[in-house]
Amino acid sequence: MGQIVGIDLGTTNSVVGVIEAGRPVVIANSEGTRTTPSIVGFTKNSEIVIGDQARRQLVLNPKNTFYNLKRFIGRDWDELDETSISVPYNVKSNDKGSVRILSPFTEREYAPEELISSIIRKLINDAETYLGDTIDSAVITVPAYFNESQRQATKDSAVLAGIKVDRILNEPTAAALAYGFEKSSSNNVLVFDLGGGTFDVSLLRISNGVFDVKATCGDTQLGGNNFDSKIVDWIAERFLEKHKIDLRRDRQALQRLTEAAEKAKCELSGLQKTKISLPFITTSDDGPLHIEEEFDRKLFESLSDDLLDRLLEPVQIALEDSGWDAEQIDEVVLVGGSTRIPMVQQLVKTLVPNEPCQSVNPDEVVAIGAAIQSGIISGDLRDLLLNDVTPLSLGLETIGGLMKVLIPRNTPIPVRQSDVFSTSESNQSSVVVQVRQGERPLASENKSLGKFRLSGIPPAPRGIPQVQVAFDIDANGLLEVSATDRTTGRKQTVSISGGSNLNEQEINMMIAEAKSKSTEDRIKRSVIDRKNNALTLIAQAERRLRDASLEFGPYGAERQQRAVELAIQDVEEFIDDDDPQELEISVSSLQEALFGLNRRFAAEKKVDSNPLQGIKNTFGSLKDELFSDDYWDDDPWDNQMNSNSRNSRYGNSRDDDPWDNDYFL
């Protein structure tokens, strides 16, 4: 049986680690370095090169050398923004709307997962050489804010590389495992993970080998590459102003600018100023042109102000979700090479009073954590327990376009949640389960993860069939949804493994937008709820009228039936109007009319059990004719009177109104 390793699959660099003699070890690659550039390229002979070899041909062969591939994984073409496709190589959409990367040398199109699998395969080969043994499985890390499709696509890349994924592990959680390994103290830890292409922040409670994730937040469109782009744009704009040439339109020049920007960024972590020198960057009618620019830390910080602002919000959201104050944080762990930027470190110090931990290598700590998790799985490490969470809320679309959340964000995983829903129309033979991910109350403003149809539901009035919908998230954060018709036992299941994915900008703004538009959302929801409640009441009233016709005949309760019919007409008249007050009045009138009809039903039941009751009913009817406006004030449709258990089969009960519109599909 082969060994298991831990892999940090990064946007910029990747690292592989393993447990040896009970301790995590980072494995050097075949070139002798401990980090492998996440770059894949092809030579003129169509030979594939990976890592440092691919990096060396970036400038001379930009169209056949591919980096930042992690930004494409698990995403469709229409979800990419201008920043993602601003690369020197060709990125396009195929006829299915999927991202494809073109190599002129091989004359082939590649899926991002296929190219990333080459990086994984190199890491595995180097590890097998070091260990002298085969490797058949791995723990692979992903950003905490990766969605379901991105996680599944990462898993698919590993399968293409020929290995099994035993666990998809969130990067901040892996870093916390590395930090807390062999520590017996209890600490509240904030992991600040700013990598090359993504940003995550997680809050954990670490105590005696138990790693309990409390909250996570992030931005999958923010990383060190964004800081590089600020420098690239500054250089390019100055050159454009001087020479009227935009270097960003030249693939080779753009690659040289990007490398120079990254170098300047790194140098400014230890120096106050640096020089950017790019001879023969391009040519004009007057001859070759060069770049010679002074660039200092103060200018870099002024260019990056907006990026620092974007780092603040996820930290604040994570603190709010965890219920902790900044003063309760005992340790701050910095992860990712971009946390070496002085202004980033200074920002962290303003957020949390404690000095950041300097005892871990930000480039290797995630791989070490992945190796520790691999040791837990293999049994080489014991007495360690990891409790992770799901980063975004998961639910489904219900009648009126509302989002019904089944699993809220920051719920510990693995988890299973279920609820019972019903049909929104009479004799409805099927229901569509539309799975959504996000924080907005309106389903259309959350991201669709997939949908499926449960058919074969026996004909029945609206609200009678019972459909059990269950959401299952495994330890990898991968989702499976099932729907079961309780009457027939018919079941339909779908694993969320592709299709629609979260747009990076949507993820970045999702929680913040939900908060900023909470008032607008409440108004929209109240309008939908009023309309749905009115439709439900009409359905109840029509069913009660049919019962009355069977019980009393056409004239037995004529006055009460006529009152209900007129009240239904009033509700139908105002249901699509923009005047909520008129609708509320008409609904109230229908409730009163139904109450009168129900009183007549109750009176008839008493007649059946007591012959003298008929005399009382006669006087009661006379009273109704003379004092028809004097109805009781009790609400016959009080939600508390109609509570029932929805989910007793699954060990949790609900006290909600059984006609609550959240439960119609």
Swiss-Prot record:
The keyword Phosphoprotein applies. Residues 642-651 have a biased composition (Low complexity). Disulfide bonds: none annotated. It comes from the Bacteria. Keywords: ATP-binding, Chaperone, Nucleotide-binding, Phosphoprotein, Stress response. Coiled coil: none annotated. The keyword Phosphoprotein applies. It holds the Pfam family HSP70. Residues 634-665 are annotated as: Disordered. PROSITE patterns: HSP70_1 (PS00297), HSP70_2 (PS00329), HSP70_3 (PS01036). The modification Phosphothreonine is found at T198. Induction: By stress conditions e.g. heat shock. InterPro entries: ATPase_NBD, Chaperone_DnaK, Heat_shock_70_CS, HSP70_peptide-bd_sf, Hsp_70_fam. One of its GO terms (molecular function) is ATP binding. Belongs to the heat shock protein 70 family. PANTHER family: HEAT SHOCK PROTEIN 70KDA (PTHR19375). Acts as a chaperone. This is Chaperone protein dnaK1.
